[in-house]
């Protein structure tokens, strides 16, 4: 709901269903652009430009999202990445490395909404994965106290590390039994069951002034 009008969109927003335009391409990079249109205005009331740049550097893939507000009023938005990685075998054969020991809160979900409940979660350098961890849904940690997550196999093989310095939250997700695992940098998150659905009051919403730009970056380092 924004300024008294209801807007409906799918889970995870509308951008993933749109066609981006290739606006720049170099030897090791490319930039894609999405701008607002009549189609996006049916789901999202603001004018915007969203640029996504992918850059290969040595053994890393850098991903930069640039949001620009070309209009005359503040825009409200959330943004997230959804990198997923193929599993060669069962999820039980893999682990995550958070670079240290952290006590965090997992925010619990009912349907597509946070229900206000949390669960204590201990993260470490050898956090073993299993389908049981994701039986109800994703693990979402708000304001992560770490800036990277390593992904490897229990035999000691290090596969990759996702680096992100300024994420608002991170989601860890798979479908039990599926051949993939996702580490999702987030700047904003789903609504709550007790929300009044007003966009201005949505927890975690990002704000951008007219004619301003904000960038969000993360990288995938291969080992």
Give the label of every model feature segment.
Residues 5, 9-58:
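Extended, loop-rich substrate-binding clefts of extracytoplasmic carbohydrate-active enzymes
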Residues 193-201:
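Short, structured beta-strand/loop micro-motifs enriched in basic residues and often containing a Trp
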């Amino acid at each position: 709901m924004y300024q008294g009008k209801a807007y409906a969109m799918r889970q995870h927003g509308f951008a993933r269903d749109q066609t981006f335009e290739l606006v720049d391409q170099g030897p090791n990079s490319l930039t894609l652009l999405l701008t607002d249109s009549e189609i996006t205005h049916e789901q999202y009331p603001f004018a915007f430009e969203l640029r996504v740049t992918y850059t290969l550097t040595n053994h890393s893939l850098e991903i930069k999202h640039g949001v620009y507000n070309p209009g005359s009023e503040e825009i409200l938005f959330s943004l997230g990445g959804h990198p997923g990685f193929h599993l060669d075998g069962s999820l039980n054969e893999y682990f995550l490395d958070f670079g240290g020991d952290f006590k965090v809160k997992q925010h619990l979900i009912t349907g597509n909404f946070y229900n206000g409940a949390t669960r204590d979660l201990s993260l470490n350098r050898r956090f073993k994965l299993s389908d049981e961890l994701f039986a109800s849904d994703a693990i979402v940690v708000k304001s992560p106290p770490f800036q990277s997550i390593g992904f490897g196999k229990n035999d000691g093989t290090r596969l990759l590390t996702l680096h992100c310095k300024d994420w608002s939250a991170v989601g860890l997700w798979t479908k039990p039994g599926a051949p993939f695992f996702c580490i999702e940098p987030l700047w904003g998150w789903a609504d709550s069951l007790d929300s009044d659905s007003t966009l201005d009051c949505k927890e975690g919403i990002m704000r951008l002034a007219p004619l301003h730009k904000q960038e969000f970056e993360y990288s995938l380092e291969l080992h």
